[in-house]
Structure formats: C-alpha cells, structure tokens
Amino acid sequence: MSSSLFAPTIETIDYPFPPKPVPLSDAQKADYKARIKQLLIEKDAVLVAHYYTDPEIQALAEETGGCVSDSLEMARFGRDHPAKTLIVAGVKFMGETAKILSPEKTILMPTLEATCSLDLGCPIDKFSAFCDAHPDHTVVVYANTSAAVKARADWVVTSSIALEIVEHLDSEGKKIIWGPDRHLGSYIAKQTGAEMLMWQGDCIVHDEFKANALRDLKSVYPDAAILVHPESPASVVAMADAVGSTSQLIKAAQTMPNERFIVATDRGIFYKMQQAAPGKTLIEAPTGGNGATCKSCAHCPWMAMNGLKAIEASLSNSDKTTHEIFVDEDLRVKALIPLTRMLDFAKTLNMKVKGNA
C-alpha cells in the first residue's frame, strides 16, 4: 500500500480557452491542403501530428509522409527524418521536446498559443522551489511539461514507461517527487506501492471524465470494454477493462475481442483507433453527467487550434516569430539528460517508449 504525500495545492487556474478555428468550406480545405503539400516540399519540411489533433490534420500528416503519434515519438520521428524543418501539430511542450532532440532543425508550430493545462499548472519557479525543499528526493516528471521543468528533473517519463521507471527507483530505495499529473501519479503509486510526493496538476480533458455517468453508459452497453487513460480520476480508472497510454489504448481496441469500446481519453484518438480496429464501435466516455456541463468535452481546446489555415501560415509566413520554437541551449542540454535517461532505460527493457504526451 502506498503512502503518497501531496504537494501544497497551487491556486486554481482559470484556463483561458482559445477560440476555435473558423470552420472552412470543403473548397477552402482542399485549397489549404494542396498549398500545404506544396510548401512542405518547397521548405524541405515534414508534418508530425499528435493523436489528439483533429482527424483531417492526422490524415494530412499521413498523406504527406509525416507521422501521427504521441509527443515523444513525434520528436524522435522528426529527429530521424531527413527534413530540415519540422511542423509540429500539437501543443507547445511537444515543439520544445522536438527542439531538445533536434537542435539543428527548424521547429515550427501552427500556433505558439497552443498550450497544456499540465504545463500551465506546473510553473518552473514554484516546482523548482518545491524540489529544492526536498533535496533527498529523485525528481520524476511527465513528458507533458515545459523544457524548464524537464531540465529540473532527474527523469522524464511517458505514461507507457512510468510504472517501470518508478518501480525501478522504488526498488533502489529512492524517495520520489512526481509531477505534474496527480491522477497519473496516484495510479502509479497504487500500482507500484512507491512513496511519492506529488505535485497537484491535472489534464483538463481527462479530469472531466465522470465515474457515475460512465457507470450509466456501461449499463446501456454492457458488452462494451472500457478503455481509460491513467490521467483520468481514480474512480474512472477503477472501472477500466484496460488502462494505458494512447498507443496502448489503440492496441487494446485492436486486440480485445469486444465489438464496442467506451473510450476515456481525448476523442482525437478515434481517428487512429478506428484505423486499427475498423469493424469496431467507439463510444466517447462521458465528461458531464447529472446535468453537469463539460469545459473540454473530451477534446483538448489547444489541440483544436492546429487547423489547416494555421499550418499553412506556419509554412508561408516569412516572419516566423509567431511559429518558431526556441529553447535556450543550456536548458536544452539539461533537459536532454533526463530524456536520454528514459530512452536508455527503455532500451534495457527492450521496449519502444510510447506515451500519451
């Protein structure tokens, strides 16, 4: 049984949700896609998109020889691809991770305003002070963090390898600081028995899944398997037939015998999940329930900012200040250390690291 301790609660953040991109007509979409395809060739660029972006963006990445995956695989694909420029359709920390692994490349994003509640909820000054107050602890941070927070950490982990790394550190008798996702941290502590001092951040999408409403939905579809990302509350995770990272949930939909799945993660994943399990029915897990309203409604508002118009602008604008990612070199070198530590650990386990981030 774990005896996890919690960090002092940081003040509640009222996240400023961005406006959604203006819907485009089919003709406009076709024009933007054609223009983007041409610009990718002209600029020696490749498009990498996260599982949580809109389906048409994921499809465009696939059509143009790019990549659709989690943030770390996006960064690794970009590092290993010969293109000199990477267009990262995702949120800002993903662009930073790509820059950390590919400092010599130009990293562009459709918008630098696309952020993440986990990143916003873990400001480096407060997190660093918290770590300084517990110098005997090993600092483990989730990949969904800023370059500065990664640079302050001993280990960076994705959701698919977090259990193994925490288990390893616990077996060595290490005390652990975990940040920033409290739900994922609680899940790991419960699974491993490790004592973890936890930062109190959460993902606005996963935090909204409701156990009571999920129970009601399950009664409507009793034959459906419930797939849950561990950034969800413990009450939701407890109902899962499979818990895992984005890649692991896609694999579960593909391999489990059920014909129906209730999916508790960002609905952007349905595009690749349906590809992997073409004959199966995917149902969104409820984020409201009992008259409650949802804020994110199972889709990250910042991921939704990655529209065709913004991607075209990132490639065509001569002024890159609103699109290009820069990471201070000293910070980059420091952040690369815990990232490399994770990748090396994964090699010893002979596993390919995929996570949510």
UniProtKB/Swiss-Prot annotation:
Its EC number is 2.5.1.72. Iminosuccinate binds at H50, S71, Y142, A143, N144, S159, H229, P230, E231, T246. Disruption phenotype: Required for growth on defined medium, and on defined medium supplemented with nictotinic acid. [4Fe-4S] cluster binds at C116, C203, C300. Its main location: cytoplasm. Pathway: Cofactor biosynthesis; NAD(+) biosynthesis; quinolinate from iminoaspartate: step 1/1. Keywords: 4Fe-4S, Cytoplasm, Iron, Iron-sulfur, Metal-binding, Pyridine nucleotide biosynthesis, Transferase. Binds 1 [4Fe-4S] cluster per subunit. The keyword 4Fe-4S applies. It is found in: Cytoplasm. It catalyses: iminosuccinate + dihydroxyacetone phosphate = quinolinate + phosphate + 2 H2O + H(+). Catalyzes the condensation of iminoaspartate with dihydroxyacetone phosphate to form quinolinate. It holds the Pfam family NadA. This is Quinolinate synthase. The keyword Ligase does not apply. GO terms for biological process: 'de novo' NAD biosynthetic process from L-aspartate. GO terms for cellular component: cytosol. Its cofactor is [4Fe-4S] cluster. It comes from Shewanella oneidensis (strain ATCC 700550 / JCM 31522 / CIP 106686 / LMG 19005 / NCIMB 14063 / MR-1).
